[in-house]
């Protein structure tokens, strides 16, 4: 067997770092924050004991990690053709043949089945929401909208916003206005976050023939869309007024700060990529700060 043939065969083992790439662990971890916040708020608002709820919360987090990781692995399987074209994806194990398609599918479906088992052990609503998230991300986003419409980011935002709902129903069993408010925050946050990333990688998406908004409609249209979604975020803290005035004020300032950064940095930026980078960095911090506020302020109210 030649050296070239040996190198082209998928490795029988992948490293832990490569496994993290396959299941998109960074994305998974980011979604666990709102999932935990949803469960935490359900504990607080329904007067459950936090200590007695720890097993439910842990099972919810494990189940959520598994279904999200499995869905992301399946996304990587389906996207291999376009990932091979995009320069930023060349280190993915699915692109450089570090894992076979067979093992990738076993990993993906195994994780999703185990994750769904965990969520259904909690209650039926948690399991159903998990299924909605999987089907929405894999079918409606990855297979359909990502390759066919500039609305792909918005379509993908729906399953991407399911984690706080899963967190809430894992404890409460029913969806409430508070849970819907958390869902809407994550839903409106995602287009801004991913449009900023799409601006940074506009040339790559064009090369791969993926109809991301910046690649098809241009920077101006994308920037307008980002500001529209920012405006949609502005009233959402008021849906969480049960957390108190302090939370509403701080969350509103967080929203206004993002709007301010978007408006002022655009005037100063010498190119659109620098502006998109600032918006992207703020988006990463925004989600963490918002849900930390949710947890901390509700904890203070308990005390």
From Swiss-Prot:
Primary localization: membrane
Reactions listed under catalytic activity: heme b + (2E,6E)-farnesyl diphosphate + H2O = Fe(II)-heme o + diphosphate
The UniProt record lists the keyword Cell membrane: yes
Bilayer disposition of the protein: Multi-pass membrane protein
Keyword field: Cell membrane, Heme biosynthesis, Membrane, Transferase, Transmembrane, Transmembrane helix
Pfam hit, one: UbiA
Functional pathway: Porphyrin-containing compound metabolism; heme O biosynthesis; heme O from protoheme: step 1/1
GO annotations of cellular component type: plasma membrane
Gene Ontology BP annotations: heme O biosynthetic process
Enzyme Commission code(s) on record: 2.5.1.141
Regions crossing the membrane: 25-45, 54-74, 118-138, 151-171, 175-197, 224-244, 246-266, 280-300
Subcellular location: Cell membrane
Annotated InterPro entries: Protohaem_IX_farnesylTrfase, UbiA_prenyltransferase, UbiA_sf
Gene Ontology molecular functions: protoheme IX farnesyltransferase activity
Additional comment: Carbon 2 of the heme B porphyrin ring is defined according to the Fischer nomenclature.
Family label: Belongs to the UbiA prenyltransferase family. Protoheme IX farnesyltransferase subfamily.
Subunit note: Interacts with CtaA.
Family annotation (NCBIfam families): cyoE_ctaB
Described function: Converts heme B (protoheme IX) to heme O by substitution of the vinyl group on carbon 2 of heme B porphyrin ring with a hydroxyethyl farnesyl side group.
Record-linked PANTHER family: PROTOHEME IX FARNESYLTRANSFERASE, MITOCHONDRIAL (PTHR43448:SF2)
Protein name from the UniProt record: Protoheme IX farnesyltransferase
Organism placement in taxonomy: Bacteria, Bacillati, Bacillota, Bacilli, Bacillales
